[in-house]
């Protein structure tokens, strides 16, 4: 991706890679957002996209919070638990980031069975939301299990993609402009 820049209050910052993805063309699925080497490990940030950005309603914050709790608990108790770094919501409320640490590079198709299993677990979940107490959670009343289960079922029913659509580039004089 290009080193597109933004200017704000005298700063000249490079636009981060995830903002250079064409969000008007992202579908449902699991995408590699970035890969980093940390020590001897490959830390991969996966974009688990449940909604089409700017094309359908975002997930309600209460449901996002519940999805975060139930899926994070599932992942951290799965056979993959030693490789889970983080599971958390995107600010745009269209999906989640899943960070893994592995000895070799892994891709979306390798974690697809785990993500599908986590969402099936959520879709069928009964009982209290894990960690939804005043002691364990900073906003324990901000939960909605029925809507979280609905969103899990809807996501599982979608056809998933595994490659980001490339950002469209256009030349404007000496500049390259991205539509994302």
Q: Which residues does each predicted region cover?
A:
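A domain-level signal for the structural core that forms small-molecule/cofactor-binding pockets
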Residues: 74, 133-134, 175-178
